[in-house]
Amino acid sequence: ESIGLLPDGEKNIEHDDKQIINKHGAEFGFTLKEALATPTFYIVAAALCTMSMLVTALHFFQVSIFEHQGLTPSIAAWMFPLSAIIAVLTQPIVGRCLDKFPTPRVITMSLATLCAALLSMSMVSDLLTAILYAVIFGINNAFNMTLFGYLWPRYFGRRHIGSVQGTGQMIGVIGASIGPIPLGMAFDLMDDYK
C-alpha cells in the first residue's frame, strides 16, 4: 500500500485537493469516538452480541439438552470435536463468501445457519440427528469466528482498529457471558428445554 500497490485490485480515490486516498488502506479508519457516533457500530455490535449469546448458550447446555432428548452425555460430548473440525474446515469457505458477496448477505447467511442450528438442536433424537446438528453448528461457528475478525475493519477501517474492535469484542464477550443465563433460568423454572 505504501508504494501504491493495493490488495484485491482496489482503486485509490482522488480527493478534491488532488490528494490520493485509499478508503480501505491502513491510513483510513474511524476513531473509536467516530465509530461510536454511527448507527452501524451498534448494529454490528448487536448482531455479534446476539450471536455470541446464542452460541455460548448452546455450548454450555449441549450435554444437558441432549440428555433431556434421550441421548447419552458421551454422544453429546463427541459432538464438540465434530463441530470444531467442521468449523475449521468451513472457515476458508466463509472467507471466500466474504470476498465474493456483499457483507450483509454473508451476515444473513450466518444468521440463517444459527437459526438452522437452533432448529436442529430441538430435533436431536438419535446419533444421526446429533451429527447433523454438530455439522450445522460447526458451520455456524465458522461464520461467527470469521465475522468477528472481519466486520470491524470492513466498516470502520484499520487505522484505529485496536480501539474499535476492542470495544466491539467487549460487547460480544458480555453477550457470551450473559447468554447462558436466560436458558438456565428457563430450565430451572420449567424443568425442560422445550
Language model regions located:
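Cytoplasmic membrane-interface "Motif A"-like loop-to-helix N-cap segments
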Residues: 99-111
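Interfacial helix-cap and linker-helix signal at transmembrane-aqueous boundaries
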Residues: 66-67, 97-98, 182-191
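Paired small-residue
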Residues: 117, 128-136
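Loop-to-transmembrane helix entry/capping segments in MFS-fold secondary transporters
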Residues: 73-74, 158-168
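C-terminal ends and interior cores of transmembrane alpha-helices
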Residues: 113-125
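MFS transmembrane alpha-helix packing/gate-lining sites
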Residues: 86-90, 140, 171-175
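Extracytoplasmic gate region of multi-pass secondary transporters
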Residues: 30-94, 103, 149, 179
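Intracellular juxtamembrane helix-capping segments at the cytosolic ends
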Residues: 143-156
